[in-house]
């Protein structure tokens, strides 16, 4: 997982702006705002940003996803159920990737030029 060669995601969305970068989290693991709760249930705010894509990933135990980097694209990954082991390091380095286990109800952020991969320890 995250060895020497990385695939570049060719989906360059738009050039980054300095203003856009100021809204990014400082750390990969994102602190979520408190949910709005009433007798009907709750609404959990996740991402309050303009975006061009949203996806849902379902993966089997033991699989690897991503294992690449993006030139200008960035994304958030919210874990609905289960967990992921998220690995990341600056693109172009040989340093050992940092691993963060992200559980249900947690979210991780990936900026451009960060090698990243996810493994799934459970279905």
Task: Say what each PLM segment does.
Residues 2-53:
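A short, N-terminal "cap"/entry segment at the start of jelly-roll beta-barrel domains
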Residues 41-42, 62-66, 94-95:
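A short, acidic/glycine-rich surface segment
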Residues 43, 67, 86-87, 110, ...:
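Short beta-strand His + acidic residue motifs that chelate non-heme Fe in jelly-roll/DSBH
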Residues 55-72:
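Conserved short histidine dyad/triad with adjacent acidic residue
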Residues 58-60, 87-88, 96:
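Extended, hydrophobic alpha-helical segments
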Residues 67-68, 74-79, 100, 107-108, ...:
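His/acidic/aromatic-lined binding-pocket segments of jelly-roll/cupin-type domains
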Residues 72-85, 89-90:
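Glycine- and acidic-residue-biased ligand/ion/polar-headgroup-sensing regions
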Residues 91-112:
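Short acidic-glycine-tyrosine-enriched beta hairpin
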């Amino acid at each position: 997982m995250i060895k020497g060669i990385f695939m570049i995601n060719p989906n360059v969305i738009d050039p980054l702006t300095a203003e856009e970068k100021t809204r990014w989290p400082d750390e990969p693991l994102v602190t979520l705002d408190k949910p709005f709760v009433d007798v009907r249930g709750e609404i959990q705010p996740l991402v309050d940003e303009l975006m061009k894509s949203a996806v849902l990933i379902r993966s089997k135990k033991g699989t690897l996803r991503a294992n690449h980097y993006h030139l200008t694209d960035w994304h958030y990954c919210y874990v609905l159920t289960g967990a992921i082991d998220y690995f990341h390091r600056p693109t172009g380095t040989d340093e050992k990737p940092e691993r963060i286990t992200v559980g249900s109800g947690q979210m991780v952020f990936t900026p451009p030029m960060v090698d990243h991969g996810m493994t799934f320890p459970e279905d």
